[in-house]
Amino acid sequence: MMRFVYIYILVIYGSYLWFSLGGNMFTINSTNRVASTIAPYACVSDVNLEDKATFLDEHTSIHANDSSLQCFVLNDQHVPQNTLATDVEGYNRGLQERISLEYQPLESIVFLLGTPAVLETKESLSLPVSPDALTQKLLSISSNDECKLSGSTSCTTPASHNPPSGYIAQYRHSAEVFPDE
């Protein structure tokens, strides 16, 4: 009887955590990424929202039909300014600064930035569609000196975590306003 009660508590607690973290997940997958003519560095990607494929262009809104949670994905924005994506040290430093100083969730909206040079061919990034959960995850990454955001495999993370990547969250007042280059 005690075992049943223990399992029941674990299931309820797990459901509470899942609800608290937003419930929905979306995955950015780089395997089908191709060049785009939209802008010199723009790219397109595939995104899965709860296993439903969605095609991404330079600026795409992802909306969960059964909730008010929403994400805007902005591809190929280099961080920091005037730093090439090949400059891993400067790139990581800029990412950490922006995560620490600039990211602000707006209600249930999350903004993502990224560059195709960051995700390896077979890597993908899955994040909860929840500003609070995303903020905590990004802040924990930014404060971990052993886990740089270059997308390299040098960062050792538990098997339950996703590979490192350079995609970060970024708040903007308007979805039409792209970050300054």
UniProtKB/Swiss-Prot annotation:
Gene deletion effect: No visible phenotype in a 12 hour, calf ligated ileal loop infection model. No bacterial growth phenotype; bacteria no longer induce IL-10 induction in human B cell lines. Bacteria grow slightly less well in human cell lines 24 hours post-infection. Deletion leads to greatly decreased phosphorylation of STAT3 in infected human cells. In mouse infections (C57BL/6 and CBA/J mice) deletion mutant bacteria are less virulent and less competitive with wild-type bacteria, mice have a reduced bacterial burden following intraperitoneal or oral infection, while mouse STAT3 is less phosphorylated.
Induction or repression: Expressed during normal cell growth and in bacteria growing in a human cell line (at protein level). Transcription activated by SlyA, which is dependent on PhoP.
One annotated Gene Ontology cellular component of this protein: host cell cytoplasm
Keywords of the record: Host cytoplasm, Membrane, Transmembrane, Transmembrane helix, Virulence
Localization annotation: Membrane; Host cytoplasm
Domain of life: Bacteria
Keyword Nuclease: no
Record membrane topology: Single-pass membrane protein
Claim: Membrane is one of the keywords in the record: yes
Predominant place of localization: membrane
Regions crossing the membrane: 4-24
Subunit structure: Interacts with host (human) STAT3.
Task of the protein: A Salmonella strain-specific effector that induces a host STAT3-dependent anti-inflammatory pathway. In bacteria-infected host cells (human) leads to phosphorylation of host STAT3, at least on 'Tyr-705' and interleukin-10 (IL-10, IL10) production; expressing the gene alone in host cells induces STAT3 phosphorylation and IL-10 production. IL-10 production requires STAT3 in infected cells. Contributes to virulence in mouse infection models. Encoded in only a few S.typhimurium serovars, it may be a specific effector for adaptation to bovine hosts.
Miscellaneous remark of the record: Encoded by the Gifsy-1 prophage. Also called pagJ, but this gene name had been previously given to a different gene (AC O30647).
Protein known as: Salmonella anti-inflammatory response activator
Species of the source: Salmonella typhimurium (strain 14028s / SGSC 2262)
Gene, per the UniProt record: sarA
